[in-house]
Swiss-Prot record:
This is Acyl carrier protein. Keywords: Cytoplasm, Fatty acid biosynthesis, Fatty acid metabolism, Lipid biosynthesis, Lipid metabolism, Phosphopantetheine, Phosphoprotein. 4'-phosphopantetheine is transferred from CoA to a specific serine of apo-ACP by AcpS. This modification is essential for activity because fatty acids are bound in thioester linkage to the sulfhydryl of the prosthetic group. Residues 1-76 form the Carrier domain. InterPro entries: ACP, ACP-like_sf, PKS_PP-bd, PP-bd_ACP, Ppantetheine_attach_site. Carrier of the growing fatty acid chain in fatty acid biosynthesis. The gene is acpP.
Amino acid sequence: MSIEERVKKIIVDQLGVKAEDVKPEASFIEDLGADSLDTVELVMALEEEFDIEIPDEEAEKITTVQSAIDYVTKANA
């Protein structure tokens, strides 16, 4: 499973949204109905899945599906 697929699966699981709604440009809060607690839990799930640490100042920048994919890809490089 690619990084993109794994990130999308985490988003579906964490936010309870349909896979087809998880588009690269989708905003977690505006498009997928997440609140601030959801986004914190999402970041924690990404950290656990990919065994990375995402500092708070970086986590604040992860607001869309694509930004999450990009961050994890860079962290795994």
